């Protein structure tokens, strides 16, 4: 252990940060075996193993966690604001119960992401996968308007945390992580010579997965 950091109590709890040094493993040489990960809204991670052709989905529980806490927080807020309104308080502060629910939600999501990314790292080590390719969709959220509800869900998804957790866990085993830009991939036809804004705007996409081409 190199360092211990104790942060002052906040909302009744304090943070203890333990910093320790580990020997960084060398990156493994590529063997042509990779795992590709497609990040999504309903299925957080859809994975494909190039070695055995296996496809599996991880992260279905994430939206259930989000829905549960959103519903519970909304219920508690409704009761709290009604009580404060009866007392003549027009703009009440958030209650301890509400703040506790937000912390509980944050911890539950963080724990779930850690467990999911740990499972992927262990799977790659077991199957001798030396490269993981994951879609980088952070810019997609900025460039597209998919409606209020969908936009809200997309912005709440902790993609950046997921990237960081996955990257350092894979790095401990010498496994490379590649982030693949995914802008315009859904608008371009599979027959397009390249994936770009120009081809996306020219694409005659009728519906999801259906294109009309001249080829």
Predicted regions and their residues:
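Well-ordered mid-protein domain cores that form the structural environment of catalytic cofactors
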Residues: 1-7
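Positively charged, helix-rich recognition surfaces that bind polyanionic ligands
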Residues: 8-215
């Amino acid at each position: 252990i190199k360092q211990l950091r104790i942060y002052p109590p906040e909302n009744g709890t304090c943070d203890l940060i333990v910093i320790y040094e580990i020997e960084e493993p060398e990156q493994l040489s590529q063997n042509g075996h990779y795992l590709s990960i497609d990040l999504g809204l309903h299925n957080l991670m859809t994975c494909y193993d190039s070695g055995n052709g296996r496809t599996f989905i991880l992260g279905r529980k994430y939206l259930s966690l989000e829905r549960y806490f959103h519903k519970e927080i909304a219920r508690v807020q409704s009761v709290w604001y009604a009580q404060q309104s009866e007392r003549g308080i027009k703009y009440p502060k958030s209650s301890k119960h509400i703040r506790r629910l937000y912390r509980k939600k944050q911890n539950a999501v963080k724990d779930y992401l850690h467990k999911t990314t740990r499972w992927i790292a262990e799977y790659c080590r077991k199957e001798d996968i030396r490269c993981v390719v994951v879609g980088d969709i952070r810019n997609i959220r900025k460039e597209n308007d998919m409606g209020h509800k969908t936009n809200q869900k997309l912005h709440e998804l902790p993609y950046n945390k997921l990237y960081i957790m996955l990257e350092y866990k894979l790095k401990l085993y010498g496994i490379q992580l590649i982030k693949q830009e995914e802008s315009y991939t859904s608008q371009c036809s599979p027959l397009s010579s390249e994936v770009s804004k120009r081809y996306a705007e020219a694409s005659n996409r009728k519906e999801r997965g259906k294109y009309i081409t001249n080829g």
